[in-house]
Structure formats: C-alpha cells, structure tokens
C-alpha cells in the first residue's frame, strides 16, 4: 500500500529561473510557484501558465500560503496600491491547475503518448516505456503494482477521478491510464506537484507515489 500523505515529487527541473515568494520571501523555482498579475481593473488574476502580460507577483503553490497572502493584503502592500482579490482565490487556482493538467493529458492522448482502459494500458506497458500510471481516485481496485512490465522509475498518480479521466478519452469513465516517458510526463508531474499544494490534508484522493 502507498502512504496517504502527499509525497512531493523529486524530479529534475526544466525551468532554472527562480523568483521570490512575496509572502515568505523564500527564493523558489518558478515551477514551485504561482504567478499573479494585476488587470486594468486592479483585480489580481492567477496566471498558472505564466504567460499573461504585466508585472508578475509570485506565491508558493500552497493553499495556506495563497490564503494567508489574500487575507493579509500582501498584494496591496507589495504594489503600494489598493487591489482586489477573489474571495475564493485558492479554489480558483486549484481549478485552473486541474484544467491545465487535463489539457496536458489531452495533448498526450492526441500525440499517441497516452492510452486509457485496463486492457490498453496492459498492451502499452508491454511495448512502451511508461512514465506515469494514473489510477482513478474513486477506483475500488487495489492501488498496487498489479501489472508487470512497469518501469521502476514510473510514477503512480491518484489525483484524478474516473469521470475526469473519461473526459480525456470522450468516455463516461476511465479507471486506468498511462503516459509514456518523456516531455509529457515531465510537464504533467510538475503541474500535479503544484496542484497537490491545494488539496485539503484530509482529502485522500491526492498523491503521487512510486
């Protein structure tokens, strides 16, 4: 059995640029942070893709950090100008990160680097090098290494429901999926690591494990 706590991913960084968290003042990799920008209406917007124009403000990708920054008016203090923040900022970020993960999985599927369904996953594992094996968070099946041919460095991910996985494949539900080793695996694991910072501690659907 795997542990029920979130196991932080120890993977190589693709982005070596670092930024300072405006709350903790820690210097962190951008891949561990959430970027924010201020719109023309002085409303703070989370920029999870890091592409929006404007000055970037950064916070660690942790729910408690984001909530504390909003409650303490950190954005206003740093900008020295009154700005507004969504009352549900942390939940908004979780939704955006989850959507980003869905988009990455959709790209992997269209590129032929992701398959879903127990039988197809088995065939995939026998012929390709798996980077991520996804088991639906609401699955009643054992979360153990049932299949053979699983690479020792493959990661098991349990943070997406069968309905979420089903949407990737235009089906009602999918319990098992696998993504080949490579850039899709690297990028998705980085996003899942950020996403895991916004799960509730008591929520057992969220973890990455080997």
Regions from the language model: what does each represent?
Residues 17, 56, 71, 97, ...:
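Helical mechanochemical/support elements of P-loop NTPase systems and associated helical scaffolds
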Residues 56, 111-112, 129-132, 153-155, ...:
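Short active-site oxyanion
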Residues 142, 147-157:
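Short acidic, glycine/proline-enriched helix-loop-strand junctions
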Residues 153-196:
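Short basic, glycine-rich beta-strand/loop surfaces that mediate nucleic-acid
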């Amino acid at each position: 059995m795997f542990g029920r706590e979130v196991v932080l991913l120890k993977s190589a960084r693709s982005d070596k640029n670092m930024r300072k968290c405006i709350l903790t003042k820690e210097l962190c990799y951008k891949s561990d942070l959430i970027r924010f920008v201020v719109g023309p209406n002085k409303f703070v917007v989370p920029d999870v893709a890091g592409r929006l124009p404007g000055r970037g403000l950064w916070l660690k990708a942790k729910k408690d950090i984001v909530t504390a920054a909003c409650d303490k008016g950190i954005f206003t203090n740093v900008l020295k100008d009154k700005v507004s923040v969504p009352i549900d900022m942390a939940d908004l970020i979780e939704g955006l990160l989850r959507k980003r993960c869905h988009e990455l999985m959709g790209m992997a599927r269209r590129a032929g680097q992701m398959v879903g369904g127990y039988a197809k996953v088995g065939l995939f594992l026998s012929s390709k090098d798996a980077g991520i094996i996804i088991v639906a968070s609401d699955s009643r099946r054992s979360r153990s290494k049932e299949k053979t041919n699983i690479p020792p460095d493959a990661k098991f991910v349990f943070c997406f429901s069968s309905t979420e996985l089903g949407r990737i494949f235009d089906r009602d539900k999918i319990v098992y999926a696998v993504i080949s080793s490579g850039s899709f695996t690297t990028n998705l694991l980085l996003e899942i690591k950020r996403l895991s910072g916004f799960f509730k501690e008591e929520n057992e659907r969220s973890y990455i494990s080997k």
